[in-house]
Design a protein with these regions (language model features):
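Alpha-helical transmembrane segments
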Residues: 12-16
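Bacterial N-terminal signal peptides that target proteins for export
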Residues: 1-10
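C-terminal motif of bacterial Sec signal peptides marking the signal peptidase cleavage site
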Residues: 18-21
Length: 333
């Protein structure tokens, strides 16, 4: 997926790869000087994605109490390692539905609640793998906003929680979590940071064949299905509301570009639906993909292999329909 670097005449080829385990901050390294990059310099950046981990840390069925080789972040870790070995430059993202889905998730949320001073088990594993950023899935809201705020170390400004300044700062994941289309009813602002700009240095090849290092700023924006307002009405009604994927992207993507994003990655916990667009639709990614400025779209939620015969009959989800969609693997709900 070639795109022109905003700050240099380099070409970046970004290949998106989806790895599904199935069931913090900006991390920026800013510099006051930008090195000159020769015209024709090229690089390849592999974007790796997990989705719908659902607290499947190990390949284990907690109900049957036996190993299950079809699931597990431990198994996906080997795929991540292999992809990193094959590509000099990689970034790792997650598309949400992380904290709920197994007995372990319920145990840490409902039976023996994870302490504020401890990190959720799945986040410990993900931090070991070195994720760069991730979105928020619909199942993140299943245990309520207080619990979600605790395990992600977010002090939500919502009606039914204490003022943010009074909320404890707890252990959350080390990577940036982004969500643009869920906003507080108190101030109309997103309850998570809507996007993050990540400064990275990647290996590239100069026109003369020599190896060089070039800076790149990767913008990452997150979305979740607006239908959470029905699915988790008891936890969300009166506290938050949602905005449509297209409208939200049209608001923030130009802002990300204006701040210097060379590439904009949209992580949307949803799938492609060729129905007419609605701001409340569950799987609005065919429409999201058409928003100008989005270079990469990473999806999840549907627990299906993306390029099925039915999916191939849909319009392209590649931004501006100019790039082939990545082959992806998802899993059962």
């Amino acid at each position: 997926m070639p795109t022109n670097l905003a700050r240099a005449a380099a070409l970046l080829a970004a290949s998106a790869t989806l790895l599904a385990a199935c069931g913090g901050s900006d991390n920026n390294s800013n510099s006051n000087t930008t090195p000159q990059i020769a015209v024709g310099t090229s690089a390849k950046l592999a974007l790796l994605e997990t989705t719908d981990l659902h607290q499947n840390i190990l390949g284990y069925d907690y109900y049957k109490l036996k190993d299950d080789p079809s699931v597990g972040l431990d198994r996906t870790a080997t795929l991540i390692a292999a992809a990193r070995a094959q590509n000099v430059n990689t970034m790792l993202f997650d598309a949400g539905d992380i904290i709920q889905g197994t007995v372990l998730g319920d145990y840490q949320a409902l039976v023996s609640k994870v302490a504020c001073t401890d990190k959720l088990a799945i986040f410990k594993a993900m931090d070991k793998l070195g994720f760069d950023a991730g979105a928020i899935g619909n199942h993140e809201f299943n245990y309520g906003l207080a619990y979600l705020g605790q395990v992600t170390n977010r002090q939500f400004n919502v009606k039914n929680l204490p003022a943010p300044a009074s909320q404890a700062k707890c252990q959350g994941p080390a990577y940036a979590q982004v969500l643009a289309n869920v906003v507080s009813t108190l101030d109309g602002k997103p309850i998570f940071q809507p996007y993050v700009l990540l400064d990275r240095t990647i290996a590239a090849t100069a026109p003369d064949g020599s190896s060089v290092k070039v800076p790149i700023k990767v913008g990452v924006i997150g979305f979740t299905p607006p239908t959470i307002m029905s699915w988790d009405k008891g936890n969300l009604e009166g506290n938050v509301t949602t905005t449509g994927l297209k409208e939200t992207a049209q608001q923030y993507v130009p802002e990300m570009k204006a701040k210097g994003a060379d590439i904009v990655v949209a992580i949307s916990h949803g799938g492609p639906d060729n129905a007419a667009y609605s701001p409340t639709m569950e799987n609005g990614n065919l429409h999201l993909a058409q928003v100008p400025g989005i270079d990469v779209l990473l999806m999840g939620h549907m627990h299906q292999v993306f390029r099925t015969p039915r999916a191939r009959s849909l319009p392209s989800t590649s931004p501006a329909s100019t790039r082939p969609p990545a082959r992806s693997r998802a899993c059962r709900r």
